[in-house]
UniProtKB/Swiss-Prot annotation:
Lineage of source species: Bacteria, Pseudomonadati, Pseudomonadota, Gammaproteobacteria, Enterobacterales
Name this protein carries in UniProt: RNA 3'-terminal phosphate cyclase
InterPro entries, per the entry: RNA3'-term_phos_cycl_insert, RNA3'_phos_cyclase_dom, RNA3'_phos_cyclase_dom_sf, RNA3'_term_phos_cyc, RNA3'_term_phos_cyc_type_1, RNA3'_term_phos_cycl-like_CS, RNA3'P_cycl/enolpyr_Trfase_a/b, RPTC_insert
Described function: Catalyzes the conversion of 3'-phosphate to a 2',3'-cyclic phosphodiester at the end of RNA. The mechanism of action of the enzyme occurs in 3 steps: (A) adenylation of the enzyme by ATP; (B) transfer of adenylate to an RNA-N3'P to produce RNA-N3'PP5'A; (C) and attack of the adjacent 2'-hydroxyl on the 3'-phosphorus in the diester linkage to produce the cyclic end product. The biological role of this enzyme is unknown but it is likely to function in some aspects of cellular RNA processing.
Cystine residue pairs: none
Protein family membership: Belongs to the RNA 3'-terminal cyclase family. Type 1 subfamily.
Keyword annotations: ATP-binding, Cytoplasm, Ligase, Nucleotide-binding
Predominant cellular place of this UniProt entry's protein: cytoplasm
Amino acid sequence: MKRMIALDGAQGEGGGQILRSALSLSMITGQPFTITSIRAGRAKPGLLRQHLTAVKAAAEICRATVEGAELGSQRLVFRPGAVRGGEYRFAIGSAGSCTLVLQTVLPALWFADGPSRVEVSGGTDNPSAPPADFIRRVLEPLLAKIGIHQQTTLLRHGFYPAGGGVVATEVSPVASFNTLQLGERGNIVQMRGEVLLAGVPRHVAEREIATLAGSFSLHEQNIHNLPRDQGPGNTVSLEVESENITERFFVVGEKRVSAEVVAAQLVKEVKRYLASPAAVGEYLADQLVLPMALAGAGEFTVAHPSCHLLTNIAVVERFLPVRFGLIEIDGVTRVSIE
């Protein structure tokens, strides 16, 4: 019988990341875990709908037995069974992030007995979670280099607070892992600006694009008008394609915040990324930790190791026999498997 791993949900960033990573790793390794103080420091502590959906999705895919799977719970016991490939559908029932639920369960399906398809309904454009286009255009090409083949499709947008979006991913079992080396991003090839609108006047998008174009040389400027019933909502994105990596940054528009201010937030974030020679942006960095650990080798550079990144590394090291090394050189942090 495998030992029970005890986790403190208040450690590190103290949010849902610890729980999501633990669920993924428990499903993969077969190790049960107990987590306490789930999101204890948040305004609404304990499990929200998004986290509860991730727990139930993980339990269904690996036939786990679970204690504490209810809204507001700050303690959870998860005992996994065998991971089964297949077709799955999960509904969050709010504007909670579809992609965060997907990212919880997909790693386990890399080791399933056959191909799988997972569809999640909920929020797709959430200020605190990656949109589907980030997964599709940034993360999945890098996963493919590691030997992980999955394809994410955005079927319907769902903005906060209404939700109603749908995202699906098809995934195949991994045959073998490769080593990812991302020391330098290389020269910029092109930059693309994109605005999504649903039930919002077109002039908002035009002003946002104009703000981006005032700071960067954009090779593409795209405005996409979505059906009104998918909103109201607005997201501004800027994609930076370099020789070795494509990064994508986004900001979700807010009521009573001008188009110029929304776009200026994005400009600031992209400039911060470009000011450093590091290959990987802050959010992508913590998404690479688990696949790199499973491969047993690899490295990337990031400007600043975020609390999310350090928390993710700490959880991975509890479940897998790997150790990460972080070395700062000339203002850039090199993250590697030791």
